[in-house]
Amino acid sequence: MEKKIDEIDFEKAGGIVPVIVQDNNTHEVLTLAYSNRESLELTRKTGLSWFWSRSRSKLWQKGEESGNTQQVKKILVDCDQDALIYLVEPSGPACHTGERNCFHHSLL
């Protein structure tokens, strides 16, 4: 069932929702980011991953500086309509450190 952007609950977390980014082919979790309404609209319009930077308080496109873009193939919405999954085809590493994903440290 396709959802509309108006159905996403951006207000629960102050105008943003968490976005889990997964590789479309392997389903490996690549990163966790945040989206506001505008970045979600840009993602749907361009087919590339756009997010809201909480630390810089601005929109950013994944790969705009590094070239490691993410082609978004599907966007999933959770049952509470307050979290998203982007299924992507990455053109390079997801992490700014150069690692394939941002989850390369273990606690257990």
Swiss-Prot record:
Keywords: Amino-acid biosynthesis, Cytoplasm, Histidine biosynthesis, Hydrolase, Magnesium, Metal-binding, Zinc
Positions of Mg(2+) binding: D78, D80, D82
Binding site residues for Zn(2+): C79, C95, C102
Cell location: Cytoplasm
Domain of life: Archaea
GO CC terms of this entry: cytoplasm
Cofactor(s) demanded: Mg(2+); Zn(2+)
Biological process annotations from GO: L-histidine biosynthetic process
Secreted as UniProt keyword: no
Catalytic activity, EC: 3.5.4.19
Biological pathway: Amino-acid biosynthesis; L-histidine biosynthesis; L-histidine from 5-phospho-alpha-D-ribose 1-diphosphate: step 3/9
Principal subcellular localization: cytoplasm
Record NCBIfam families: PRK00051.1 (NF000768)
Role according to the record: Catalyzes the hydrolysis of the adenine ring of phosphoribosyl-AMP.
The protein, known as: Phosphoribosyl-AMP cyclohydrolase
Species: Cenarchaeum symbiosum (strain A)
Gene symbol of the encoding locus: hisI
